[in-house]
Amino acid sequence: MNKFNLIKNSHHEFYELKENDLIKAEDRLGFLFPKELREFYLEIGYGFINGNNNAINRFLDPATIADITLREDIYEFDPDLDGIYEDEDKLVFYEVNEGVYLTLDLNKTDKSSVFFLDKKIAGSLEEFIKKVDQNDRYFEDMAD
């Protein structure tokens, strides 16, 4: 299907992800990743959106998402996660900067809305990727 190919360019750095690594993270979590995120991982992988040198802009790998969600490893006592990222209907998937993340809505089946804090910034992962490919900080003013 290759719907995420637009993000494969010299401005970004992605790493291949084996399906087995995706399955291991899902087993740890006890649920499947949203359909769009699974497709993205298998088509593109995980890695960095380059643009603003003052930001991390990282699509998190599945193991890190599991660590954050389960509060394990270095995320066990991470105060940045308290309160803001504890909604069971949302999944942290993207690191904007240290301690600042974007989340996906887990209630949708085909398309997952993307949120910056509590503000919806895209109706789907595909829409988010198109926007962030053009401007990696497009959503920052939307949170106000």
Tell me the role of every PLM-derived stretch.
Residues L42, E140-D144:
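Short glycine-rich, low-complexity/disordered patches
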Residues D110-L117:
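Short polybasic amphipathic segments
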Residues A122-F139:
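Compact, glycine/acidic-enriched structural inserts
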Residues M1-V100:
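A surface-exposed partner-binding patch
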Residues D21, F115, F128-K131:
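Short, hydrophobic/aromatic alpha-helical segments in well-folded domains
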Residues V100-K108:
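Broad, structure-driven detector of short, well-ordered beta-strand segments within folded domains
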Residues F93, I121-A122:
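Local beta-strand/beta-hairpin segments that build beta-sheet-rich folds
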